[in-house]
Design a protein with these regions (language model features):
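Active-site capping/gating regions of soluble enzymes
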Residues: 17-18, 26-33, 38-48, 52-121, ...
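Eukaryote-specific, cytoplasm-facing alpha-helical/coiled-coil scaffolding segments in long proteins
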Residues: 325-327, 416-423, 466-475
Length: 499
């Protein structure tokens, strides 16, 4: 029995009896025929981070074969205004069969697929975020011999009218249950739909943020994923945001992934966990502790952290979240189980003990390989990020740390490490993260060569990112907004539906 296929929530995996990475055009057509699918949706995230959709009617078998093979053309200048001019803007979109899923929302049976962009010469579009991540993952594997895997923690607020019943404690919503947590069932429905699209979910829960304001209840939730090859991980996060928003609209709820929605309340992040794999083994851990490879990768993230904000924090409001005492990082450092550091090493089941048999005394020891669970977590990004650019940037940073002289990288990791006792004294001795989009641009300009190395990020893409971020013109804006509630509200509203 293949345990990855049995009980799989994706109807295509269940029907075809194979993992999604093995889907072929023939498989897609067989499923369409058997299940009475009438429409095809091509889906692709644009520069604003949101999924765009192109609908096709399956007129006949010949047309179905054509769209699956040849794709379609789209206006690239509308999708990527910072990278493409209107005078030469046409792109092709070609479906990736491994991403196929049945739309959980369409009344007409519809099969959806994420697409890749190609230029007029039939070459992958160099500024496509998805292709950039592909190049980053390939360069990482070629350089290190390891594969880069990731998963995200997707935080969001659900907003609805406050009926005054069973109020939760302000800023104490972590893992709360109903009736004090109002949207547990909505979150579970989101998780079920995300799983149907192919998302591999670890768990979901209510988060710290919970407050009432102007007759509305604001409840923060989180859905966390399982580690996957980094390209798959990015696809799953993009689709998850699409699912949550659509389901909220159907239920008469409002949802925001914005990094900050009011002063003094927990903001929403998009924490990214990473691990490096080789031959089915997790290279993050050795002899029950963090490996040298992991610490060298962390060193790379310490060096590139300021410029990674250009990919992971794309609105001015992003930097209102990166302030002290809000479980968000402000300084470039790392540590164990510490939510104030930039890169956190969470608990990783490193004791080697089977805890289950201690409470389930009828069971035999399972001898599971718990080393697979160890990750490290980058805590600065939020959902304004271009998820593909962000994960590509993290690939580059970890590769850079591994390509440095070994002793130099390990020394950087040592210098940037914060122990528990040291953290209590404050982190001010460490370099601060940028405080605005404009400040992040300055770091990207300094470090762009590292991202362009091996052709991962194109110069054209970096130029476009710099132009877009500079338009925010937000130097000193955080300080001004903290003193001006009307300005703060205006900025929050402008990024309410970001990403």
């Amino acid at each position: 029995m293949d345990k990855t296929i049995e009980m799989n929530a994706n109807p295509l995996v269940e029907f075809l009896r194979k993992p999604s990475k093995c889907f072929t055009k023939a498989d897609i057509i067989a499923f369409i025929r058997e299940k009475g699918i009438r429409m095809i949706d091509f889906m692709y995230p644009a520069e604003d981070g949101r999924i765009k959709t192109l609908n096709f009617m399956i007129n006949d078998y010949a047309y179905l074969e054509t769209i699956l093979t040849d794709g379609e053309r789209v206006d690239g200048s509308s999708l990527f205004p910072s990278f493409i001019e209107a005078e030469s803007s046409d792109l092709y979109v070609i479906p990736r069969f491994r991403t196929a899923f049945v739309s959980p929302f369409s009344e007409i049976p519809t099969l959806c697929m994420l697409c890749s962009f190609f230029d007029k010469n039939g070459e992958p579009f160099e500024c496509s975020p998805e292709r950039t991540l592909h190049r980053a993952a390939a360069a990482f594997e070629e350089s290190t011999g390891m594969t880069f895997e990731a998963m995200g923690e997707l935080e969001y607020y659900v907003i609805a009218d406050d009926n005054g019943m069973f109020p939760a404690v302000d800023q104490r919503g972590y893992h709360e249950s109903g009736p004090f947590a109002k949207f547990n069932e909505f979150r579970k429905q989101c998780m079920a739909y995300i799983a149907q699209t192919g998302g591999q979910i670890k768990y979901g829960h209510s988060e710290v943020g919970n407050f009432t304001q102007d007759g509305k209840v604001y409840e923060q939730n989180e859905i966390e994923f399982l580690p996957n090859p980094v390209e798959t991980a990015a696809d799953q996060l993009v689709l998850a945001k699409w699912v949550i928003r659509n389901l909220a609209q159907m239920n008469g709820l409002d949802v925001t992934f914005a990094p900050k929605i009011t002063v003094g309340k927990a903001g929403s992040g998009l924490h990214i966990h990473m691990r490096m794999m080789k031959d089915g083994k997790n290279c993050m851990i050795k002899d029950h502790k963090l490996s040298e490879e992991a610490r060298r990768a962390i060193a790379g993230m310490m060096i590139l952290a300021p410029s990674i904000t250009a990919f992971g924090n794309k609105t001015s409001v992003s930097y209102f979240r990166l302030v002290p005492h809000q479980e968000a990082p402000t300084n470039v450092c790392w540590g164990d189980c510490n939510r104030s550091v930039l890169v956190r090493v969470p608990l990783g089941w490193t004791s080697g003990r089977d805890m289950s048999v201690q409470v389930n005394t009828l069971e035999a020891e399972a001898n599971n390989d718990t080393t697979l669970k160890q990750t490290v977590e980058m805590r600065s990004p939020d959902a304004s990020a271009d998820i593909y650019q962000l994960m590509a940037g993290l690939c580059v940073a970890c590769r850079y740390g591994l390509e440095m002289e070994k002793e130099e990288a390990l020394q950087i990791a040592t210098d940037k490490y914060v122990g528990i006792d040291e953290a209590k004294k404050g982190l001010s001795k460490f370099e601060q993260l940028p405080d605005s989009c404009v400040a992040s641009v300055k770091w990207l300009e300094k470090q762009r060569g590292l991202y362009e190395d091996k052709g991962v990020f194109s110069a054209r893409m970096i130029d476009g990112i710099i132009r877009a971020l500079n338009k925010q013109d937000d130097s000193n804006l955080r300080e001004s907004a903290e003193k001006d509630s009307k300005l703060m509200q205006k900025l929050v509203e402008s990024s309410f539906y970001c990403g």
